[in-house]
């Protein structure tokens, strides 16, 4: 079995996740540019940018509970509608407090789409194909992020902030037709178990060791990934680059991501999870340290490419790790608990960048993110270990 066997899932599973990622990535580039350009400081820009991660963390447990009971399609449809409403709010009232609130809801909705798709896919795909299935999930996200980051700065330049926020919502809305058949025919789905399914508290207690294993590494890596998304635009602003140029610099790293995601899945399935993850996340840390000597657009581009190589080789790794450790009963609830811990990093990353950069500068922020990633790699290698062969090692 290979990537071709995943073709039936491209539209119903990967399509909605790709659509919501497109909208989210437009916002991640546009928000720091808009806020700093309007005279707000790094801290305000980082707080608003981090609100998306906060929304994802807050939504994680409710989304898992709902998915186990009502099914991935209904949850995915509701999440996409929330994303559309959030974009309308941001376009209507473009003040920092409303941008933060809208981004909070947008982040929660994107998390709902992701978890509902992952829960469905986890139950359908055998472990021997899981690395490639989840790397394709990461790869489709990277393709949408590449598109979003490439046009995010351009849209701010050409259309202005309000239209950019609306377009982010329209991008997410593309995924709605993919989940509607499942809403009309819940019997097509595998994941929903109804009201007799396990309680969230029971799932967490019974799987707390695996929850900490996957969640803490996910939090470390997400801190670095999300911090990078805020740091690179701020470095571009510090170099007096145009918003469109900043968008291209950020997108260049995602081009490398997109090329390498099939390699990530093949290595995870054929060699092992650690063989793909340790070198990949190590490159992400190295790329951040390269920013210390980058004082031109070319230097930032090269650093972004190194980070992109690492991020591409890690495509789908967090999805794979959590799916490897997920129990048969209460799969969506477990995945949502892991996601909640992981998404704390989505809040910490932008906040670290804003607070450290505001006090000690952007170089210090880059070092801080690199250290966070290295600590995560120590945890992964020394504590978590290889998960690809744990089909029978579940509590």
Question: What annotation goes with each model-predicted range?
Answer:
Residues 1-7, 184-214:
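Juxtamembrane intracellular "pre-TM" segments in multi-pass secondary transporters
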Residues 6-53, 211-217, 221-235, 239:
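Helix-loop boundary and gating motifs at the non-cytosolic
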Residues 97-105, 298-306:
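Paired small-residue
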